[in-house]
Amino acid sequence: MAGKKGCRLRTIAYTKTFKKDYQRMAASGRYDMALVNQVGGLLIAHTAQQVLSAQWSDHALIADDEWDAGDRDIHLGGDFLLIYRIDPHPEAKDMEIVIFKRLGTHGDLFG
């Protein structure tokens, strides 16, 4: 099992809050939930940060009471946001874990 040269393999994990957010957003019928899977695939594939920044407005969040250092924000379209982070895998030294933390609108996540 090898990732791109010099890259660690990645896996995805979901917080309990993210799972609830996902169900709520999917049930509303107003958001393209396939975009969540698409971005997850890009993150696992080590897509260059420049590509994510250009297409999805990927950027770091400022650490505060709500968000931790290392948390990032991707704009999936309009007012549809994904908060995630990438950490070393807790059990496998040669892997990273992409953690989907929250999903929602600006009002849901920052208001």
Task: Identify what each model region corresponds to.
Residues 1-78, 87-97, 101-111:
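Basic, Lys/Arg-enriched alpha-helical interface segments
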